[in-house]
A protein has these predicted regions:
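N-terminal segment of the mature soluble domain
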Residues: 118-230
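Short, Lys/Arg-rich cytosolic juxtamembrane segment immediately N-terminal
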Residues: 19-30
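Surface-exposed short loop/turn segments
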Residues: 204-266
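Short secondary-structure boundary motifs at beta->alpha junctions and helix caps
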Residues: 267-319
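N-terminal intrinsically disordered, acidic low-complexity segments at the extreme N-terminus
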Residues: 1-19
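Transmembrane signal-anchor/signal-peptide helices with a preference for the extracytoplasmic
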Residues: 43-61
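Extracytoplasmic low-complexity, Pro/Thr/Ser/Ala/Gly-rich segments
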Residues: 56-139
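Hydrophobic membrane-insertion alpha-helices, especially the h-region
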Residues: 31-49
Length: 330
């Protein structure tokens, strides 16, 4: 009987199958239905993207608004100071103008005051951008530690590990790092952030800056009294043929070389000190066991040379001896 019904079916087989599907409650996708489903899917994705972009843009504008509030508060004090410091560095990197010791420097009041410190090679001081790049990686060295006598406030408070590192002077790189969220570069990166993850990273950077770094920047602009600058002149002895790499600040500090030492009063803008001196010292091992590690020996040699440079500066700024009775004719 089924075979007879099958033989009697007329029309296209596809139409017959469609009739059977409808009668049994089943349905088949048509081209129109597939296109409609695809269109709905694309529309949903577009709607999700639009909503996400609107939310991201709202978060971006909120972050930039908070950044502008900090910039309005701190920027008018930090940016002029930054520009002045960079101008002093670039001017000092030109032809050396000869030694100069202001009477105020001889009083050595700066040694116990809060201030800023930067040391770099003369050859690297090309423009403001190069100063910022070098300062970001610069570290304090034994020269500042041997020359300055900043009171250890953390030690006086009894803070743990207060003696590990002197608080003063601030490294100029600390000031740059503390004020990074104020820069046009940072704002540009926030504006260019094209996904939620990158925007969250910038939001965390802002939160960290406000919590930990902006207080340092406020301290710098409010308390810093002087800017101590050391510019090291290159010498061929600092280049090790075996290394084959570029000359570095650490390599220079291992060998005797001329160093330009400048001191600026940040309250008046006056240059108090300008010296060209060479730090040269010899490390003499003591004890039964000599230091075998090359890295440790190099660190000791740099420390000795830098403290020797500080002694040369000490000698230059020491008050002249009082005239004797024979000199005055009495």
């Amino acid at each position: 009987m089924a075979e007879l019904r099958k033989k009697r079916e007329r029309g296209l087989p596809a139409i017959a199958r469609a009739r059977q599907d409808r009668s049994s409650g089943r349905s088949r996708w048509t081209t129109q239905a597939g296109l409609l489903a695809a269109a709905l899917l694309v529309a949903g994705l577009i709607a999700h993207k639009v909503v996400s972009e609107r939310g991201r843009e709202g978060d971006r504008q909120a972050l930039l608004a908070k950044q502008r509030a900090v910039a309005v508060t701190l920027g008018p004090e930090w940016f002029p100071l930054r520009d002045k410091l960079e101008g002093d560095v670039l001017a000092a990197a030109k032809d050396f103008a000869g030694d100069h010791v202001d009477p105020q420097a001889r009083r050595a009041e700066f040694r116990t005051q809060p201030g800023l410190y930067l040391r770099m090679r003369v050859a690297e001081a090309k423009d403001a951008a190069s100063v910022r790049t070098v300062a970001a990686d610069a570290r304090k060295d034994a020269f500042a530690a041997c020359l300055l006598r900043e009171p250890n406030e953390r030690g006086a408070r009894g803070d743990a590990d207060a003696g590990a590192f002197a608080e003063q002077p601030w490294n100029l790189g600390q000031a740059y790092a503390a004020t990074r969220i104020l820069t046009d570069d940072w704002v540009g990166e926030v504006k260019a952030a094209d996904d939620d993850l990158r925007l969250r990273i910038f939001s965390r950077q802002y939160d960290k800056a406000v919590r930990d770094e902006i207080p340092v920047a406020i301290d710098v602009v409010k308390r810093a009294q002087f800017f101590l600058l050391v510019l090291d002149e290159d010498v061929p002895e600092a280049v090790k043929p075996a290394d084959g790499g570029p000359l570095t600040e650490e390599a220079l500090q291992l060998v005797p070389h001329p160093s330009r030492v400048h001191l600026f009063d940040l309250t008046t803008g006056k240059e108090l000190l300008r010296l060209l001196r060479t730090g040269d010292a010899r490390v003499i091992p003591a004890g039964e066991r000599a230091v075998a590690d090359e890295e440790t020996r190099d660190a000791m040699q740099r420390q000795a040379n830098n403290c020797a440079l500080a002694r040369r500066v000490d000698e230059a700024i020491a008050p002249p001896p009082a005239p004797t009775a024979a000199a005055t004719g009495n």
